[in-house]
Amino acid sequence: MSRRTVAKKRPVAPDPVYQSRLVSLLVSHLLKKGKKSIAYNIFYAAMKNIAETTSQDPLEVLRQAVLNITPKVEVKSRRVGGATLQVPLEVKADRGTALALRWLLIAARNRSGRNMVSKLSAEIIDASNNTGAAIRRREETHRMAEANKAFAHFRF
């Protein structure tokens, strides 16, 4: 991490089917060992599964899920006088989306089920309904920030 200049944000190309940058971000987080075509196949199958299950637009279900998972505040460690404090900070939009996608995929991978398609679609549906492991993760983060609100004046 250079102290001299801030790294520029690279533009994210939208995916070929939904023309959505959010989908591209999710697929790039989903892929393993550089196999993006397999990641796209898994994702599109999950979206098809969501459309059949909920009879709603799957992209809207995904957007709602990511919106529900996105944290508003998080805690970061900061050393103050020999003690390490958990300082609550507001989350910027880009970081919030990145955290939401990461938590969504972690929750989907840890879920019990037959394959990643069913696990991912179930987790997205749960997150859009404000339930599921990813939502619990967000609430846990918010609780930790609330508990350490007294250290908010130590912000960076």
From Swiss-Prot:
Query: Gene Ontology terms, cellular component aspect?
Result: chloroplast; small ribosomal subunit
- GO biological process assignments: translation
Keywords, sorted A to Z: Chloroplast, Plastid, Ribonucleoprotein, Ribosomal protein, RNA-binding, rRNA-binding
Broad class of the protein's primary localization:
plastid
Please verify whether the record's keywords include Metal-binding: no
Cross-referenced InterPro entries, in alphabetical order? Ribosomal_uS7, Ribosomal_uS7_bac/org-type, Ribosomal_uS7_CS, Ribosomal_uS7_dom, Ribosomal_uS7_dom_sf
A molecular function annotated in GO for this UniProt entry is: rRNA binding
Classification via SUPFAM superfamilies? Ribosomal protein S7
Q: Where in the cell is it found?
A: Plastid, Chloroplast
Please describe the quaternary structure of this protein: Part of the 30S ribosomal subunit.
Q: Which family does it belong to?
A: Belongs to the universal ribosomal protein uS7 family.
Q: What role does this protein play?
A: One of the primary rRNA binding proteins, it binds directly to 16S rRNA where it nucleates assembly of the head domain of the 30S subunit.
Q: What is this protein called?
A: Small ribosomal subunit protein uS7c
Q: Identify the gene encoding this protein.
A: rps7
